[in-house]
From Swiss-Prot:
Localisation: Cytoplasm
Enzyme Commission number, as recorded: 3.6.4.-
Family: Belongs to the DEAD box helicase family.
Record organism: Bacillus subtilis (strain 168)
Binding of Zn(2+), residues: C60, C63, C84, C87
Assembly behavior: Monomer and dimer in solution. Interacts with DprA and ComFC; ComFA-ComFC form rings about 150 Angstroms in diameter with apparent 6-fold symmetry.
Requisite cofactors: Zn(2+)
One Gene Ontology term, aspect cellular component: cytoplasm
Residues passing through the membrane, by range: none
Protein name: Competence protein ComFA
Pfam families to which the protein is assigned, alphabetical: DEAD, Helicase_C
Function in brief: Involved in transformation (genetic competence for DNA uptake). Required for DNA uptake but not for DNA binding to cells. DNA uptake is energy dependent, this protein may provide the driving force for DNA uptake. Does not have helicase activity, translocates on single-stranded (ss)DNA in a 5'-3' direction in an ATP-dependent manner, but does not unwind double-stranded (ds)DNA. ATP hydrolysis causes the release of ssDNA from ComFA. A ssDNA-stimulated ATPase; dsDNA does not stimulate ATPase. ATP hydrolysis causes the release of ssDNA from ComFA.
Positions contributing to ATP binding: A146, V147, C148, G149, A150, G151, K152, T153
Cofactor binding, note field: May help stabilize the protein.
Native organism taxonomy: Bacteria, Bacillati, Bacillota, Bacilli, Bacillales
Length: 463
């Protein structure tokens, strides 16, 4: 329903709430043309060209796309009109359609917020929390480089509490919807009574502006100059690491004078280089919250595993390893390089006496299968790299079939190894890279984990 403008009125608070710190198309605004024009004329709203054209070079002002291959034309009202294909899934941006924003500075008006989490941080977590609070006060960039299972979410809590009570808006941005769904209930439990929104495609909160936001990086395309403290979780994860439009979305959604925090167990080389050279403020947490060393991966040669799978056979070394752990009541993750190999492996395991399922990115029942695995209803879960992050299962043992495959980068292998040993009661466990020839990525991943364990022992972060 279009909301009309009242004669002789001041600005519309409803329109202000809709547009403040946002970057929206006309189709996303349920207000009359008269109202919008009045607010533009009186200086409350800016209407910015959606696409900038300079010497026949195009730039999308919503997603920042400048690659000319992403621009095309559609026919409307007898004309060919330019539009951006890069962000079209969020509503079509074209040369004749403006992006609207509210011009006034967004002032916070929420009540003081108290952390309701009653856990205790480890010394390493507390160190990171203190550095984060300092970075927020100084509006700095910060890298929190913490191993898988270090309790990265919990170490953010004191900094989030401090920021919210200064009237600063905080956003945790992550490349994956799965992570938003996992983090949202934890943050709502830790900050009971706070207004928290979870933003992802299809969410009820989509487009909301709240003091604490957990968002996919895609959803940030709808915001502009909104965030005081931007925390990028899994900065090295796909698709954020490979998509410049998502990196642009983060920068556009931040206020000009704001804090930017990178959170990762496996930071990209450029961030790592800057941190080690002192060009980027950083804090390194080399141990898990339970103070036990990271399980170090072992390499196990399994021959021509592809040939065996094509003959509907499981490599004997892999089969023996899985059967041993299943017999002992320990669940097993088996990572494979592709969906086609996953399907072959799943078919082969039908003849093995264990409760088995397989998952990949397009699996409609992925969420249910992962929950069954967590609940102990499955013995073996075969998966692609879609589950390399964010899944915690007690007592789980982790194997990689075809660890020499190019999909298994150093970062991916470190993340996969991080599935094992996350619980205090089950802090050790097996991590096996089954291979048909070692690769540099395999060696680098093992070296990475060994170095973290050595550093943790040196600074007395492990028992």
């Amino acid at each position: 329903m279009n909301v009309p403008v009242e004669k002789n009125s001041s600005f519309s608070k409803e329109l202000q709430q809709t547009l403040r710190s946002r970057h929206l198309l006309r189709t996303e605004l349920s207000f009359s043309d008269e109202m919008i024009e009045w607010h533009i004329k009186n200086g409350y709203i800016t209407a910015e060209n959606s696409i900038s054209i300079n010497k026949r070079r195009y730039r999308c002002n919503r997603c920042g796309q400048t690659d000319q291959r992403y621009f095309s034309f559609y026919h409307s009202s007898g004309k060919n009109k330019l539009y951006c294909r890069s962000c079209v899934m969020m509503g079509r941006v074209s040369e004749e359609v403006p992006l609207y924003s509210w011009k006034e500075e967004n002032e916070s008006n929420w009540k003081s917020i108290k952390l309701t989490w009653d856990g205790k941080l480890s010394s390493g977590q507390q160190k990171a929390a203190n550095v984060l609070i300092e970075a927020i006060s100084k509006k700095e960039e910060l890298l929190i480089w913490a191993v898988c299972g270090a309790g990265k979410t919990e170490m953010l809590f004191p900094g989030i509490e401090s920021a919210l009570n200064q009237g600063l808006r905080v956003c945790i941005a992550t490349p994956r919807t799965d992570v938003v769904l996992e983090l949202a209930p934890r943050l709502k439990a830790a900050f009971q009574g706070a207004d928290i929104s979870a933003l992802y495609g299809g969410s009820d909160d989509k487009g909301r502006l709240s003091p604490l936001m957990i968002s996919t990086t895609h959803q940030l395309l709808r915001y502009k100059d909104a965030i005081d403290v931007m925390i990028i979780d899994e900065v090295d994860a796909f698709p954020y690491s490979a998509d410049q439009t998502l990196q642009f979305a983060v920068q556009k959604a931040r206020k000009k004078n704001s804090t930017l925090v990178y959170l990762s167990a496996t930071p990209p080389k450029e961030l790592k280089r800057k941190a080690l050279n002192g060009q980027l403020h950083s804090v390194r947490i080399p141990a898990r919250h339970h103070r036990k060393p990271l399980p170090e991966p072992r390499f196990v040669w399994c021959g021509n595993w592809k040939k065996k799978l094509n003959r509907n056979k499981i490599p004997p070394a892999v089969k023996r390893w899985i059967e041993f752990h299943v017999k002992e009541g320990r669940p097993v993750f088996l990572f494979v390089p592709s969906v086609s190999i996953l399907e072959k492996a799943a078919a082969c395991f039908k003849g093995v006496h264990c409760r088995t399922a397989s998952v990949h990115a397009e699996d409609k029942h992925r969420k249910e299968k992962v929950q069954q695995f967590r609940d102990g209803q499955l013995d073996l879960l075969i998966t692609t790299t879609i589950l390399e992050r964010g899944v915690t299962v007690p007592k789980v043992q982790t194997g990689v079939l075809g660890a020499e495959s190019s999909i298994f980068t150093e970062s991916a292998l470190v993340q996969i190894a991080g599935r094992t040993g996350r619980h205090k009661e089950y802090a050790d466990g097996d991590v096996i890279y089954f291979h048909f020839g070692k690769t540099k990525s395999m060696l680098d991943a093992r070296k990475h984990i060994k170095e973290m364990n050595e550093l943790a022992a040196k600074v007395e972060c492990t028992d």
